[in-house]
Amino acid sequence: MNADDQYYPQAPIYKEPCAFQRSQGQDYNPSPPACLYMGRQQQAAYSNPLVALDPGSPPDISPYEVPPISEEPIVPHLHHHHYHHHHHHPGIPHPHHQMPFPDDNESGTLEERNRTLLPFPWMKSTKSHTWKGQWTDGSYIMEQEENKRTRTAYTRAQLLELEKEFLFNKYISRPRRVELAVMLNLTERHIKIWFQNRRMKWKKEEDKKRGRGSDPEQDSVVSSADVLKDEPQCLGNSQKTGDLVLSSPLPTSSQPNQVPSIGSLRQAEKR
């Protein structure tokens, strides 16, 4: 009996440190009791390393958050431990609760697809209209090289030869066009387009010349002979010299183009 009396009182003495530590308030003891330390060592293999308590942990994490040691499975304790951790640290998101993000390869393909596909074909910056025949559905794939026409810069020697040819032939034939293309280092298309533009310019110049020929100012200009025919003969002091009509006193014999007066005509008749 003495042995039993000595054995049973030792049990509350062993449990007293844990009970004493639990009965205290929110004060933090940097050196936890042995029972908590042993429980922490057993839970270290299953708990998250970010959640494990060590002497350098923040002071707001109290030793009462460590779940008690029991014979139940470890998984419920882990979930309970994570719950307390999220409750005291809301700024640190749990890896399981994070939103899923696409991989780098998937995001790269999406950006590439958005860059190459256009909702409307006229959004393409080009001067040609080749997309009208290529666009069959709602999506249009951009070409690698823009189909832009560049203006051909002709040299002075090329322009001189082309002008000479145009002076003789307004419409160039196919064999002559091939010869000029080889001689001037141009394509047949360049020569054909140049002759088309040159003919349009020549027609405009011809229209301007015809317009000048039918100008009313030029129609009013008549020759001196027409003026002499239309002008009535003046009696007395009128003298006609070319296009100018000059007024003069009585005619004298020194003037070659003398208009005789009425008195002189009567004297001539009497004689």
From Swiss-Prot:
Keywords: Developmental protein, DNA-binding, Homeobox, Nucleus. Gene3D superfamilies: Homeodomain-like. It is found in: Nucleus. Its main location: nucleus. SUPFAM superfamilies: Homeodomain-like. GO terms for molecular function: DNA-binding transcription factor activity, RNA polymerase II-specific; RNA polymerase II cis-regulatory region sequence-specific DNA binding. In embryos, expressed in the anteroposterior band of the endoderm, with expression continuing in cells of the pancreatic anlagen and duodenum. The keyword DNA-binding applies. One of its GO terms (cellular component) is nucleus. The keyword Glycosyltransferase does not apply. Residues 249-261 have a biased composition (Polar residues). Residues 147-206 bind DNA. Residues 204-271 are annotated as: Disordered. It comes from the Eukaryota. InterPro entries: HD (IPR001356), HD_metazoa (IPR020479), Homeobox_antennapedia (IPR017995), Homeobox_CS (IPR017970), Homeodomain-like_sf (IPR009057). A motif (Antp-type hexapeptide) lies at residues 119-124. PANTHER family: PANCREAS_DUODENUM HOMEOBOX PROTEIN 1, PROTEIN ZERKNUELLT 1-RELATED. Acts together with ptf1a to induce the pancreatic lineage within the endoderm. This is Pancreas/duodenum homeobox protein 1. It comes from Xenopus laevis (African clawed frog). The gene is pdx1.
